[in-house]
């Protein structure tokens, strides 16, 4: 198995078939809905809040609300009241089961539920998927996070409708340093490896540092790409604004950091400051245009045409072997 990450790969262009990149369709389908981009902001406290999630849903983007200090049932009611789809995160502890019971008792069904724990290839996740499928069968269940084909096969067999792939490749994640495990440094290979066995959508989570990495993720099997640091640090971002030497920054920290947990126990995340980079809508527009360009370079008109291109692995003597021609 070849090992590579985003920096080691370049996609090879094919003959362009469009007059303008604006003809290229960046939309993607997930759980019976079509979204404008194959991109979803990370379900982290410094990336999304109720206001951002509402705006994303109203403007045709996918979102996943975080699960920290939040009344999930009220959140779903609020989203439905505004005519929006509801997409929430759950853990695997007793309060999460209680939340599911409240949904059932009140006859409420979130359209998307993401079971979101650091090591998602676990019996605890199997049990939660089984419970959700029995209690709220209409919900589209995303489960993760995982980093191996065995995990993807198991999660799909347990009933997950999509899997989230990525263990520790994120900018504020220190899992590989703290534990010695993960996909940090080879996330793109791990995605390719997992996608080979997947029969349902994969959400690639973590390691995205530029818009081109989104196209690379789609090429190697992602339906949707979860992005944290590129979405943190906007004017609307919920992170605290910090001034350093006259420059404005937003706080961005990992979900398993002591900043998020409020205690120093089982810490696998850190805090950084992201320079404030304008409005979220502008970044999403730029992302859309860049992905349209990627599609035009792929010789196609639709997002999944990116999957047909060849690629080279940089930095190895054997780069030529990987041309698929």
Curated annotation (Swiss-Prot):
Q: Where is the active site?
A: 173
Q: Where is the signal peptide?
A: none
Annotated GO molecular function terms are: GMP reductase activity
User: What UniProt keywords are attached to this protein's entry?
Assistant: NADP, Oxidoreductase
Which InterPro entries does the UniProt record give?
Answer: Aldolase_TIM, GMP_reductase, GuaC_type_2, IMP_DH/GMP_Rdtase_CS, IMP_DH_GMPRt
- UniProt key word NADP: yes
CDD domains associated with the record: IMPDH (cd00381)
What are the BP-aspect GO terms? purine nucleotide metabolic process
Protein origin, superkingdom: Bacteria
Entry binding sites for NADP(+) = 202-225
| Record EC number | 1.7.1.7
Catalyzed reaction equations: IMP + NH4(+) + NADP(+) = GMP + NADPH + 2 H(+)
Q: Which GO terms describe its cellular component?
A: cytosol; GMP reductase complex
| Role this protein plays | Catalyzes the irreversible NADPH-dependent deamination of GMP to IMP. It functions in the conversion of nucleobase, nucleoside and nucleotide derivatives of G to A nucleotides, and in maintaining the intracellular balance of A and G nucleotides.
Q: Into which family does the record put it?
A: Belongs to the IMPDH/GMPR family. GuaC type 2 subfamily.
| NCBIfam families, sorted | GMP_reduct_2, PRK05458.1
**Which PANTHER family does the UniProt entry name for this protein?**
GMP REDUCTASE
The protein in question is named: GMP reductase
Q: Organism, per UniProt?
A: Acidovorax ebreus (strain TPSY)
Q: Which gene encodes it?
A: guaC
